[in-house]
Amino acid sequence: MALRAKAEVCMAAPWLSLQRARALGTRATRVPRTVLPFEAMPRRPGNRWLRLLQIWREQGYEHLHLEVHQTFQELGPIFRYDLGGAGMVCVMLPEDVEKLQQVDSLNPRRMSLEPWVAYRQHRGHKCGVFLLNGPEWRFNRLRLNPDVLSPKAVQRFLPMVDAVARDFSQALRKKVVQNARESVTLDIQPSIFHYTIEASNLALFGERLGLVGHSPSSASLSFLHALEVMFKSTVQLMFMPRSLSRWTSPKVWKEHFEAWDCIFQYGDNCIQKIYQELALSRPQQYTSIVAELLLNAELSPDAIKANSMELTAGSVDTTVFPLLMTLFELARNPNVQQALRQESLAAAASISEHPQKATTELPLLRAALKETLRLYPVGLFLERVVSSDLVLQNYHIPAGTLVRVFLYSLGRNPALFPRPERYNPQRWLDIRGSGRNFYHVPFGFGMRQCLGRRLAEAEMLLLLHHVLKHLQVETLTQEDIKMVYSFILRPSTFPLLTFRAIN
């Protein structure tokens, strides 16, 4: 179709010439003094309803990141974008992220994910902080932060993640050494998928599922399948109002609800086990995030379940694909890989004794994860429904407007990141300083930043640390991997990677 053909051409072309990039990156400093009205803002051309119809026909919007990227090149760093009956403002410069944070209210608002909310309303379940807005969101968030996001919380659950990362590395090394050539070539994505669920489940509920290096139970496999169906059906339903999609896609809605039923049943079972253990005796040591929340009793059990389900669902693909793309980029950039290996080996003894030191003793590896998320932001955009009037790029933005920050375009702007197509973790160690706080915002900003951010960072950091100490990663694929938008930004195909033992 025309949409797909246009996207292919856009992807094949260079991001934009350096001259045009400089103009785009600095245009914000060359604006008239008089603030322009909202109606004067450039608007993305095209019929809003035909665009929505095309999304429905294609069951998604795979090339959203490329189309928006192209529109920034054509219209500048801000424009209006209409889709069906909804409208939004699109921006892509760090200074606009900063301004959005400056006008955040006590309860920063973003759009809800209708398929997820519809399920919870239909089944009578509470929503967690990912779906909530208003005072209830703030009430939940302030009581979750100490046990999920705070530095103290990270220090407590990080050794649990480290244990799973070690098991993953050992299982992969075992496969390698059992091969006569001391190497193995495979699609590593399913194994990483199992790892993230295992690590998240242990940190959240204090229970191993046997997904890493063991044979998983039938209940674990059913849970995995439900997660996959839930994500797939979310993409098929998220662009169309439920009042319409309930007639056009009843089968998908049925699959979506059944998948969530399985996920919530799994969560119920985990929480009931923790309840029973706490009823017998108070634990003498840290056991899990959910156990701490139940012991604190500042949130109702239903609210704890709702938030733990969101953390479980949100911790899977959002961690899997950055890990996969980091391994792929390291395979394509052996010099970078070797530098990271040397750093991990130098810190190995210290981290082995105190896993918490991984957060401070692996600066280049942390920079590599930043570089991956710059090129491949798993969350394509950040959003706010602004609570008060503000000015972005010299245009008046009225209260109640939906503003989206497109991270794909922010990260590939040559005015911000010289040679943006190059995978160069060192750039993050070189650009630290004032004025750069909003260059790296893949987990959001302000009070609404991702609640599971520290857990995701720990899972990625520790897996890479343990794998790189012992294994060389290689690939025959030197071409860029095509990315598609499917609720999150993900690779359209998974590269084959070769893991080779290091003598």
Curated annotation (Swiss-Prot):
CDD domains given for it? Answer: CYP11B
Question: What positions does the transit peptide occupy in this chain?
Answer: 1-24
The UniProt similarity line reads: Belongs to the cytochrome P450 family.
Q: Which GO terms describe its cellular component?
A: mitochondrial inner membrane
Query: What is its biological role?
Result: A cytochrome P450 monooxygenase involved in the biosynthesis of adrenal corticoids. Catalyzes a variety of reactions that are essential for many species, including detoxification, defense, and the formation of endogenous chemicals like steroid hormones. Steroid 11beta, 18- and 19-hydroxylase with preferred regioselectivity at 11beta, then 18, and lastly 19. Catalyzes the hydroxylation of 11-deoxycortisol and 11-deoxycorticosterone (21-hydroxyprogesterone) at 11beta position, yielding cortisol or corticosterone, respectively, but cannot produce aldosterone.
Which cofactor(s) does the record list?
heme
Q: Which UniProt keywords apply?
A: Heme, Iron, Membrane, Metal-binding, Mitochondrion, Mitochondrion inner membrane, Monooxygenase, Oxidoreductase, Steroidogenesis, Transit peptide
Pathway(s) served:
Steroid biosynthesis; glucocorticoid biosynthesis; Steroid hormone biosynthesis
User: SUPFAM superfamilies from the entry?
Assistant: Cytochrome P450
What this protein catalyses is: a steroid + 2 reduced [adrenodoxin] + O2 + 2 H(+) = an 11beta-hydroxysteroid + 2 oxidized [adrenodoxin] + H2O; 11-deoxycortisol + 2 reduced [adrenodoxin] + O2 + 2 H(+) = cortisol + 2 oxidized [adrenodoxin] + H2O; 21-hydroxyprogesterone + 2 reduced [adrenodoxin] + O2 + 2 H(+) = corticosterone + 2 oxidized [adrenodoxin] + H2O; 21-hydroxyprogesterone + 2 reduced [adrenodoxin] + O2 + 2 H(+) = 18-hydroxy-11-deoxycorticosterone + 2 oxidized [adrenodoxin] + H2O
Cite the EC number.
1.14.15.4
Q: Got any disulfides in this one, which pairs?
A: none
Its GO biological process annotations read: aldosterone biosynthetic process; cellular response to peptide hormone stimulus; cholesterol metabolic process; cortisol metabolic process; glucocorticoid biosynthetic process
Q: Which Gene3D superfamilies match?
A: Cytochrome P450
This chain belongs to which protein, by name?
A: Cytochrome P450 11B1, mitochondrial
* Binding locations of heme: C450
